Protein backbone atom coordinates (compact mmCIF):
# COMPACT_ATOMS: atom_id res chain seq x y z
CA UNK A 1 0.00 0.00 0.00
CA UNK A 2 2.71 2.49 0.95
CA UNK A 3 4.60 1.78 -2.30
CA UNK A 4 1.74 1.58 -4.79
CA UNK A 5 -0.58 4.10 -3.10
CA UNK A 6 1.61 6.57 -1.20
CA UNK A 7 -1.28 9.05 -1.00
CA UNK A 8 -3.15 6.84 1.49
CA UNK A 9 -3.29 8.64 4.82
CA UNK A 10 -6.31 7.03 6.51
CA UNK A 11 -6.56 3.49 7.83
CA UNK A 12 -9.86 2.27 9.24
CA UNK A 13 -9.93 -1.04 11.04
CA UNK A 14 -13.51 -2.25 11.11
CA UNK A 15 -12.94 -5.98 11.55
CA UNK A 16 -15.21 -7.94 13.79
CA UNK A 17 -16.20 -11.50 14.54
CA UNK A 18 -18.55 -12.05 17.46
CA UNK A 19 -19.12 -15.62 18.60
CA UNK A 20 -21.43 -16.36 21.48
CA UNK A 21 -20.75 -19.37 23.64
CA UNK A 22 -20.63 -20.75 27.16
CA UNK A 23 -17.08 -21.65 28.23
CA UNK A 24 -18.38 -24.77 29.99
CA UNK A 25 -19.85 -26.03 26.72
CA UNK A 26 -17.10 -24.92 24.34
CA UNK A 27 -14.66 -27.53 23.06
CA UNK A 28 -11.40 -25.60 23.05
CA UNK A 29 -9.42 -28.79 22.43
CA UNK A 30 -11.11 -29.76 19.17
CA UNK A 31 -12.29 -26.32 18.03
CA UNK A 32 -9.57 -23.88 19.09
CA UNK A 33 -9.24 -22.53 15.53
CA UNK A 34 -12.89 -21.41 15.74
CA UNK A 35 -12.02 -19.25 18.76
CA UNK A 36 -8.57 -18.27 17.51
CA UNK A 37 -10.06 -16.75 14.34
CA UNK A 38 -11.99 -14.29 16.48
CA UNK A 39 -8.82 -13.25 18.34
CA UNK A 40 -6.92 -12.86 15.07
CA UNK A 41 -9.58 -10.77 13.32
CA UNK A 42 -10.53 -8.57 16.27
CA UNK A 43 -7.18 -7.95 17.91
CA UNK A 44 -4.11 -9.39 16.22
CA UNK A 45 -4.80 -8.08 12.70
CA UNK A 46 -5.62 -4.47 13.68
CA UNK A 47 -2.60 -4.26 15.98
CA UNK A 48 -0.36 -5.69 13.27
CA UNK A 49 -1.73 -3.28 10.64
CA UNK A 50 -1.33 -0.32 12.99
CA UNK A 51 2.29 -1.21 13.59
CA UNK A 52 2.92 -1.65 9.87
CA UNK A 53 1.34 1.71 8.92
CA UNK A 54 2.54 3.83 11.87
CA UNK A 55 6.07 4.57 10.57
CA UNK A 56 4.79 5.67 7.15
CA UNK A 57 1.85 7.66 8.55
CA UNK A 58 4.12 9.44 11.04
CA UNK A 59 5.98 11.00 8.09
CA UNK A 60 2.81 12.44 6.54
CA UNK A 61 1.45 15.94 7.03
CA UNK A 62 -1.95 14.55 8.07
CA UNK A 63 -2.94 10.97 8.81
CA UNK A 64 -5.63 9.09 10.69
CA UNK A 65 -5.69 5.62 12.19
CA UNK A 66 -9.20 4.65 13.23
CA UNK A 67 -9.95 1.52 15.23
CA UNK A 68 -13.51 0.33 15.63
CA UNK A 69 -13.89 -1.32 19.02
CA UNK A 70 -17.25 -1.76 20.78
CA UNK A 71 -19.23 -0.61 23.76
CA UNK A 72 -18.57 -4.18 24.93
CA UNK A 73 -14.92 -3.19 25.40
CA UNK A 74 -16.14 -1.30 28.48
CA UNK A 75 -19.17 -3.36 29.54
CA UNK A 76 -18.45 -6.93 28.38
CA UNK A 77 -21.20 -9.30 27.33
CA UNK A 78 -20.55 -12.56 29.19
CA UNK A 79 -21.88 -14.76 26.37
CA UNK A 80 -19.41 -13.14 23.92
CA UNK A 81 -16.29 -13.27 26.10
CA UNK A 82 -13.63 -13.34 23.38
CA UNK A 83 -15.28 -10.55 21.40
CA UNK A 84 -15.56 -8.37 24.51
CA UNK A 85 -11.97 -9.11 25.56
CA UNK A 86 -10.48 -8.47 22.12
CA UNK A 87 -12.32 -5.17 21.76
CA UNK A 88 -11.10 -4.16 25.24
CA UNK A 89 -7.56 -5.02 24.18
CA UNK A 90 -7.94 -2.95 21.01
CA UNK A 91 -9.21 -0.04 23.13
CA UNK A 92 -6.11 -0.30 25.32
CA UNK A 93 -3.85 -0.53 22.28
CA UNK A 94 -5.55 2.51 20.70
CA UNK A 95 -4.91 4.55 23.83
CA UNK A 96 -1.24 3.51 23.85
CA UNK A 97 -0.88 4.19 20.14
CA UNK A 98 -2.46 7.63 20.56
CA UNK A 99 0.13 8.52 23.21
CA UNK A 100 3.07 7.13 21.24
CA UNK A 101 2.05 9.06 18.12
CA UNK A 102 1.09 12.25 19.97
CA UNK A 103 4.16 14.12 18.71
CA UNK A 104 3.35 13.27 15.08
CA UNK A 105 0.53 14.41 12.81
CA UNK A 106 -1.25 11.06 13.18
CA UNK A 107 -4.66 11.16 14.83
CA UNK A 108 -5.65 7.91 16.51
CA UNK A 109 -9.43 7.71 16.73
CA UNK A 110 -11.46 5.00 18.39
CA UNK A 111 -15.08 4.39 17.43
CA UNK A 112 -16.96 2.30 19.99
CA UNK A 113 -20.36 1.29 18.58
CA UNK A 114 -23.26 0.19 20.77
CA UNK A 115 -25.49 -2.62 19.53
CA UNK A 116 -26.21 -1.61 15.93
CA UNK A 117 -28.79 -3.36 13.75
CA UNK A 118 -26.43 -5.31 11.47
CA UNK A 119 -25.79 -8.96 10.66
CA UNK A 120 -22.78 -9.22 13.01
CA UNK A 121 -22.30 -12.89 13.78
CA UNK A 122 -24.35 -14.03 10.78
CA UNK A 123 -27.63 -13.29 9.02
CA UNK A 124 -30.51 -12.84 11.42
CA UNK A 125 -28.38 -13.03 14.60
CA UNK A 126 -27.98 -9.32 15.28
CA UNK A 127 -31.17 -7.62 14.17
CA UNK A 128 -31.52 -5.36 17.20
CA UNK A 129 -29.89 -2.12 18.24
CA UNK A 130 -29.83 1.37 16.83
CA UNK A 131 -30.32 1.80 13.08
CA UNK A 132 -27.09 2.01 11.08
CA UNK A 133 -27.97 5.46 9.65
CA UNK A 134 -28.60 6.91 13.12
CA UNK A 135 -25.34 5.46 14.44
CA UNK A 136 -23.38 6.71 11.41
CA UNK A 137 -24.73 10.24 11.84
CA UNK A 138 -23.59 10.17 15.48
CA UNK A 139 -20.10 9.05 14.49
CA UNK A 140 -19.77 11.76 11.84
CA UNK A 141 -20.85 14.31 14.45
CA UNK A 142 -18.11 13.07 16.81
CA UNK A 143 -15.55 13.25 14.02
CA UNK A 144 -16.62 16.82 13.16
CA UNK A 145 -16.20 17.74 16.85
CA UNK A 146 -12.65 16.34 16.82
CA UNK A 147 -13.28 13.63 19.39
CA UNK A 148 -10.63 10.92 19.80
CA UNK A 149 -13.01 8.40 21.38
CA UNK A 150 -16.45 8.30 19.83
CA UNK A 151 -19.38 6.32 21.11
CA UNK A 152 -23.09 6.57 20.51
CA UNK A 153 -26.00 6.00 22.86
CA UNK A 154 -25.15 3.31 25.39
CA UNK A 155 -21.55 3.05 24.22
CA UNK A 156 -21.03 6.80 24.70
CA UNK A 157 -22.15 6.36 28.29
CA UNK A 158 -19.92 3.27 28.70
CA UNK A 159 -16.85 5.27 27.66
CA UNK A 160 -17.13 7.28 30.89
CA UNK A 161 -18.64 4.83 33.38
CA UNK A 162 -17.26 4.31 36.86
CA UNK A 163 -16.22 0.82 37.94
CA UNK A 164 -19.44 0.37 39.96
CA UNK A 165 -21.55 1.40 36.96
CA UNK A 166 -19.64 -1.03 34.74
CA UNK A 167 -20.23 -3.92 37.17
CA UNK A 168 -23.96 -3.16 37.24
CA UNK A 169 -24.18 -2.86 33.45
CA UNK A 170 -22.36 -6.18 32.90
CA UNK A 171 -24.73 -7.93 35.30
CA UNK A 172 -27.78 -6.42 33.57
CA UNK A 173 -26.54 -7.37 30.09
CA UNK A 174 -25.88 -10.96 31.20
CA UNK A 175 -29.31 -11.29 32.78
CA UNK A 176 -30.92 -10.07 29.53
CA UNK A 177 -29.07 -12.33 27.10
CA UNK A 178 -28.25 -15.58 28.87
Where are these predicted regions, by residue range?
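Conserved hydrophobic beta-strands of the Rossmann-like cofactor-binding core
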Residues: 11-12, 16
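Conserved mid-core segment of classical short-chain dehydrogenase/reductases
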Residues: 18-36, 79-82
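Active-site helix of classical SDR
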Residues: 50, 86
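Conserved amphipathic alpha-helix within the SDR
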Residues: 1-7
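C-terminal helical subdomain
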Residues: 110, 118, 122-164
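Active-site loop-to-helix junction immediately N-terminal to the catalytic Tyr of the SDR YXXXK motif
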Residues: 76-84, 96
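Residue(s) in the substrate-gating loop at a strand-loop-helix junction
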Residues: 70
